[in-house]
Amino acid sequence: MNTFYDVQQLLKTFGHIVYFGDRELEIEFMLDELKELYMNHMIEKEQWARAAAVLRKELEQTKNGRDFYKG
């Protein structure tokens, strides 16, 4: 699992399709959903850790991009 798309596809296998129109909120929600899946033993620790790392990186890039465009 290396990309944001990979994480989306993982969540999709559990019936989670996330779209709020706010990328930052979507990523934070996806992190919460991943945590719930892990805590309920639906995904392995390695899967959770890698997916969470991908999402944290994406969140950081999203926040930095948002700051960049604010001027």
Swiss-Prot record:
Protein name: Uncharacterized protein YqgQ
SUPFAM superfamilies from the UniProt entry: YqgQ-like
Disulfide bond annotation, renumbered to this chain: none
Pfam family, one: YqgQ-like
InterPro entries: YqgQ-like, YqgQ-like_sf
